[in-house]
Amino acid sequence: MKHSVNRPPTPDEDDVADGFEKDKVTLREIINVKLVESGEKENLMELVRDRLVECGWKDEMRIACREHVKKKGRKDVTVDELIRVITPKGRASVPDSVKAELLNRIQNFIVSAAL
């Protein structure tokens, strides 16, 4: 910010761009609102949960959590730390078939909702 005695501060270009971005509604936000309003988001969440259980992903994450706790010691691990350590592994290990099915369902929703 550039300051002056006689006038309010002039925002830098970065500040103007940040303000503009905050006011702009993204396509992702619009789709999310439509998914929630229609109840489809809950259906998609249930689909993902079911598919992850079917493929054994949930069991893998449970094992990874237990191994981390065993390695660090039960009293020395916090939930926040466990989430921080396991989340990247979990996201990376979601099967491509689950991602593809979810993407397909979202695309079909967008087409049917005519967004």
UniProtKB/Swiss-Prot annotation:
Domain of life, source organism: Eukaryota
Cystine residue pairs: none
Pfam families assigned to the protein according to its UniProt record, in alphabetical order: EnY2
GO BP annotation list: chromatin organization; mRNA export from nucleus; protein transport; transcription elongation by RNA polymerase II
InterPro entries: TF_ENY2, TF_EnY2_sf
GO CC, alphabetical: DUBm complex; nuclear pore; nucleoplasm; SAGA complex; transcription export complex 2
Family label: Belongs to the ENY2 family.
PANTHER family: ENHANCER OF YELLOW 2 TRANSCRIPTION FACTOR
Protein purpose: Component of a deubiquitination module (DUB module) that specifically deubiquinates monoubiquinated histone H2B (H2Bub). Does not seem to be a component of the TREX-2 complex. Seems to act independently of the SAGA multiprotein complex. The DUB module is responsible for the major H2Bub deubiquitinase activity in Arabidopsis.
Assembly and oligomerization: Component of a deubiquitination module (DUB module) formed by ENY2, SGF11, and UBP22 in Arabidopsis. Interacts directly with SGF11, but not with UBP22. Interacts with MOS4.
Official protein name in the record: Transcription and mRNA export factor ENY2
Lineage of producing organism: Eukaryota, Viridiplantae, Streptophyta, Embryophyta, Tracheophyta
Gene name tied to this protein: ENY2
